[in-house]
């Protein structure tokens, strides 16, 4: 085997931060001059999260090749330079579908198809496919869920077999939670012990245990975990709950020397990672500038921040790059009083979404921003909100709407894309992935990008109806970005407004701490200017 493989499992509780841990490890290993690839294995039976409720699963992250994935892949992107694609994710639903397809094609020659060996072999094949496609020095494989879940068992068995065949090239990290009981005044290691016992009963002996806790574990506690979990004392690592920013995680792991421990065990003798630039950025996040802007994020899933995870992070990246900080106020567009809060904000962002719930509230938000000169950034559905509001209140097309919200509207300024109406399946059938966009010169968007052609990622079925484009232009709303392949409207911009822009794509998927997205930077710049001078009056 030409690559090394790091397996990351979790125990005790869910939401431990395995995705952040995997992403942070990728950063540390890359800073040691290693080429890293990543794979997320999710035990749920959905083929992908594309049709899952955001309240249940969080946002859907889209790759360049149009794969709808778990939000953890967003962490992978933001922390590292790993290339993400269809080879970077697999679910139980996909694995079972592949096996059933092979059975129907006669690949198994009449054998009884079983979880072992057929499902486990397919999981191993997914791991090898990822390695073959990317040719990494190190492949990090994160297994979703918690040890003990029934759904996880085939994945853990596959890992056991893989480690048995390639023991010298594999490293297993088990992440657990060590709770602090206030009444007893001490931390409890028993949940970690039981979790490791469950993992060992499957046949996987972890090479390291990563313990998450509220505060630092004492050497005695680490020694106890080492003794009862049968791992060396120097293989017990600790990360505490993050105080300020998720971007502190790589620094915590670096302080624990976990990446050095891993590379030495795998025989990868590399240089010490250099995180000086990362430390500088994190220090600025810990000590934010006094120049702060308030951004109202108007949506319908605002009670669950993970539903807009990439948007939150992209705003943070942009503000940091401008030596500013951002306070994000989630505003429910169904709340009858949300406009009172939005009026006090320095900018408004309406993110992507689907369905009519909260639609009219978003339109009132766009109207407020247009009339008051508040910077407005509409993403996907947020762009469609901008267009419909403008049609109703500037073009005086009072019943203008999107056909998604009103199929009988007399003025369908937003309509379904050609070819979408005939589709029966909903999963994986939208316009997905990266497409080129040509940007008009002399526009705010061109000024932000500094170039005339960009690639951006999409996830939508509806588009601006080109039958209305000239009318919009006559009244000051311009299409300033188009797809050269399909002639679709990708970006709109309003004249005589400080910053009111809508994009059909999802720029948040490309933003990183070390490389903020230019449109988010432009938006925050406009919000800073607005916060300093709120005397704008619409012409």
UniProtKB/Swiss-Prot annotation:
Allosterically activated by GTP, when glutamine is the substrate; GTP has no effect on the reaction when ammonia is the substrate. The allosteric effector GTP functions by stabilizing the protein conformation that binds the tetrahedral intermediate(s) formed during glutamine hydrolysis. Inhibited by the product CTP, via allosteric rather than competitive inhibition. Mg(2+) binds at residues 72, 142. Residues 294-533 form the Glutamine amidotransferase type-1 domain. InterPro entries: Class_I_gatase-like (IPR029062), CTP_synthase (IPR004468), CTP_synthase_N (IPR017456), GATASE (IPR017926), GATase1_CTP_Synthase (IPR033828), P-loop_NTPase (IPR027417). SUPFAM superfamilies: Class I glutamine amidotransferase-like, P-loop containing nucleoside triphosphate hydrolases. It holds the Pfam family GATase. The active site is at residues 380, 506, 508. It catalyses: UTP + L-glutamine + ATP + H2O = CTP + L-glutamate + ADP + phosphate + 2 H(+); L-glutamine + H2O = L-glutamate + NH4(+); UTP + NH4(+) + ATP = CTP + ADP + phosphate + 2 H(+). CTP binds at residues 14, 149-151, 188-193, 224. ATP binds at residues 15-20, 72. UTP binds at residues 14, 188-193, 224. Keywords: ATP-binding, Glutamine amidotransferase, Ligase, Magnesium, Metal-binding, Nucleotide-binding, Pyrimidine biosynthesis. Its EC number is 6.3.4.2. GO terms for biological process: 'de novo' CTP biosynthetic process; pyrimidine nucleobase biosynthetic process. GO terms for cellular component: cytosol. Pathway: Pyrimidine metabolism; CTP biosynthesis via de novo pathway; CTP from UDP: step 2/2. PROSITE patterns: GATASE_TYPE_1. Residues 1-268 are annotated as: Amidoligase domain. L-glutamine binds at residues 55, 353, 381-384, 404, 461. PANTHER family: CTP SYNTHASE, CTP SYNTHASE-RELATED. HAMAP family: PyrG (MF_01227). CTPSs have evolved a hybrid strategy for distinguishing between UTP and CTP. The overlapping regions of the product feedback inhibitory and substrate sites recognize a common feature in both compounds, the triphosphate moiety. To differentiate isosteric substrate and product pyrimidine rings, an additional pocket far from the expected kinase/ligase catalytic site, specifically recognizes the cytosine and ribose portions of the product inhibitor. Homotetramer. Belongs to the CTP synthase family. Catalyzes the ATP-dependent amination of UTP to CTP with either L-glutamine or ammonia as the source of nitrogen. Regulates intracellular CTP levels through interactions with the four ribonucleotide triphosphates. This is CTP synthase. It comes from Chlamydia felis (strain Fe/C-56).
């Amino acid at each position: 085997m030409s690559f090394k493989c790091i397996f990351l499992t979790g125990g005790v509780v869910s939401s431990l931060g395995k995705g952040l841990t995997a992403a942070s490890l990728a950063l540390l290993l890359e800073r040691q001059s290693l080429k890293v690839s990543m794979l997320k294995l999710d035990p749920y039976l959905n083929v992908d999260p594309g049709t899952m409720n955001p309240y249940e699963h969080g946002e859907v992250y889209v790759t360049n090749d149009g794969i709808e994935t778990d939000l953890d892949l967003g962490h992978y992107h933001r922390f590292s330079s790993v290339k993400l694609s269809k080879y970077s994710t697999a679910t139980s639903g996909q694995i079972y579908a592949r096996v059933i397809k092979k059975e129907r094609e006669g690949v198994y020659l009449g054998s009884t198809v079983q979880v072992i060996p057929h499902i486990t072999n397919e999981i191993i094949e997914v791991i090898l496919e990822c390695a073959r496609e990317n040719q990494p020095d190190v492949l990090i494989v994160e297994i979703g869920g918690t040890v003990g879940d029934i759904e996880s068992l085939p994945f853990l068995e596959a890992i056991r077999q893989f480690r048995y065949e390639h023991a010298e090239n594999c490293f297993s990290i088990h992440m657990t939670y060590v709770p602090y009981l206030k009444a007893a005044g001490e931390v409890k290691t028993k949940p970690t012990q039981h979790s490791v016992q469950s993992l060992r009963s499957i046949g996987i002996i972890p090479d390291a245990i990563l313990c998450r806790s509220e505060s630092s574990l004492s050497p005695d506690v680490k020694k106890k975990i080492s003794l009862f979990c049968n791992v060396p004392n120097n293989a017990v690592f600790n990360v505490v709950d993050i105080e300020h920013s998720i971007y502190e995680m790589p620094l915590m792991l670096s302080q624990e020397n976990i990446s050095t421990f891993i590379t030495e065990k795998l025989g990868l003798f590399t240089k010490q990672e250099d995180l000086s630039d990362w430390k500088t950025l994190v220090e600025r996040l810990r000590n934010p500038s006094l120049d702060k802007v308030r951004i109202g994020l108007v949506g319908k899933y605002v009670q669950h921040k993970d539903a807009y995870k990439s948007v939150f992070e992209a705003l943070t990246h942009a503000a940091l790059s401008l030596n500013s900080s951002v306070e994000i106020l989630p505003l429910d567009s169904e709340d009858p009083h949300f406009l009172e809060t939005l009026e006090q904000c320095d900018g408004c962002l309406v993110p992507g979404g689907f369905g009519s719930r909260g639609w009219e509230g978003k339109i009132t938000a766009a109207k407020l921003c247009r009339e008051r000169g508040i910077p407005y950034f509409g993403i996907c559905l947020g762009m469609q909100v901008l267009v419909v509001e403008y049609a109703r209140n500037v073009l005086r097309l009072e019943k203008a709407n999107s056909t998604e919200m009103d199929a009988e509207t007399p003025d369908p300024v937003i309509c379904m894309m050609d070819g979408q109406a005939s589709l029966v399946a909903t999963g994986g059938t939208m316009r997905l992935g990266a497409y080129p966009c040509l940007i008009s010169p002399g526009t705010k968007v061109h000024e932000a990008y500094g170039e005339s052609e960009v690639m951006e990622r999409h996830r939508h079925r509806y588009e601006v109806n080109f039958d209305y484009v000239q009318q919009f232009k006559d009244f000051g709303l311009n299409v300033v970005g188009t797809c050269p392949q399909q002639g679709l409207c990708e970006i709109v911009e309003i004249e005589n407004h400080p910053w009111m822009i809508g994009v059909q794509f999802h720029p948040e998927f490309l933003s990183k701490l070390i490389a903020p997205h230019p449109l988010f930077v432009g938006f925050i710049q406009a919000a800073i200017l607005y916060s300093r001078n709120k005397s704008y009056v619409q012409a």
